[in-house]
Design a protein with these regions (language model features):
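Positively charged
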Residues: 1-153
């Protein structure tokens, strides 16, 4: 996949809820790899921006798969972590309003209120449960991508 496979508004699929994955198959692993390729291709076309994360719906696959950059600080670190069926199990901290961008909403940034801390439950590519305690930018990114899985843009 390339950046051209990333769908944008007003594509109606972005407003549809993604389906839960019950078994991690080779197709799911391939999808995560293709999503990573598309995110990195998008990033390579923008020298001063990073691709923080991507949800499968953004490449027109209505499955609850999210990739999240392993290191937001270094663009040279091109590794992403895959989360399958991510769900927020706890909201914590204060609600903070800050600007967000989206690969599916070209050239528009908007202020969005998000919890400063969350806890997320998901599966990894081995089908094992993972739990993440996130705060700050990671918490914001995870809430954004989980919104995508729920058909929210």
């Amino acid at each position: 996949m390339t950046k051209d496979d990333i769908i944008t508004l007003p594509n109606p699929h972005l407003r549809q809820k993604s389906s839960k994955i019950h078994v991690v198959t080779n197709d799911v692993v391939k999808l995560a790899d293709e999503m990573t390729a598309a995110a990195l291709d998008w990033e390579d076309s923008r020298p001063h921006e990073i691709s923080a994360a991507l949800a499968a719906v953004q490449v027109d696959k209505l499955e609850r798969v999210v990739i999240v950059r392993a290191d937001f600080e270094r663009k040279s670190t091109r590794e992403f972590i895959t989360l399958i069926n991510p769900e927020i199990v706890k909201y914590e901290g204060e609600i903070v309003e800050d600007f967000e961008g989206c690969l599916s909403v070209k050239s528009i940034y908007g202020k969005v209120p998000r919890y400063s801390k969350i806890r997320v439950k998901a599966m990894n590519l081995d089908g094992e449960e993972v739990r993440i305690k996130a705060e700050g930018f990671l918490a914001r990114v995870l809430q954004h991508e989980i919104d995508h899985c729920n058909g929210l843009v």
